[in-house]
């Protein structure tokens, strides 16, 4: 990729999780990865308090693995859906139970009810690349 910001993926993983498999797979496919563990306890995500988030603003795709049982994580996902360009693929990793419980919130994103496999991440990377190509052609 010519532009180092091209194809950047934002990987949201729970605090304590390293997301190394996802990061390594996406980087092997040519996508720089920015990791976010969500806001530290007692703080507000900059996306929710209108400061904006540089990790989000550079993202050409988002893999969201934060805990939807936490209201501020739900708010972050809603904010992604509100602010992301229509062509930015968003994938959410949840349990089958949470997929049902939060079906309304997850309606406009693709849901993985298992840990992403290399094939899942490859398909996601292809969507990011396709969106980048279309965006480049439109400019």
Task: Please give the residue ranges for each predicted region.
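Non-catalytic signal-transmission and effector/linker regions of two-component phosphorelay proteins
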Residues: 1-31, 36-57, 81-83, 110, ...
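Glycine-rich, charge-decorated loop segments at or immediately adjacent to ligand/cofactor-binding or catalytic sites
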Residues: 96-110
């Amino acid at each position: 990729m010519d532009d180092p910001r091209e194809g950047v993926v934002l990987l949201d993983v729970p605090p304590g999780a390293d997301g190394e498999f996802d990061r390594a797979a996406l980087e092997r496919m040519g996508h720089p990865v920015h990791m976010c563990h969500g806001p530290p306890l007692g703080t507000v995500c900059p996306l929710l308090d209108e400061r904006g988030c540089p990790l989000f603003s550079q993202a050409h795709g988002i893999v969201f693995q934060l805990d939807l049982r936490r209201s501020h994580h739900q708010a972050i996902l809603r904010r992604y859906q509100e602010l992301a360009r229509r062509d930015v693929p968003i994938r959410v990793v949840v349990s089958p139970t949470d997929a049902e419980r939060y079906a309304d919130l997850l309606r406009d994103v693709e849901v993985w009810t298992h840990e992403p496999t290399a094939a899942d991440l490859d398909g996601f990377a292809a969507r990011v690349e396709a969106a980048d190509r279309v965006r480049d052609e439109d400019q």
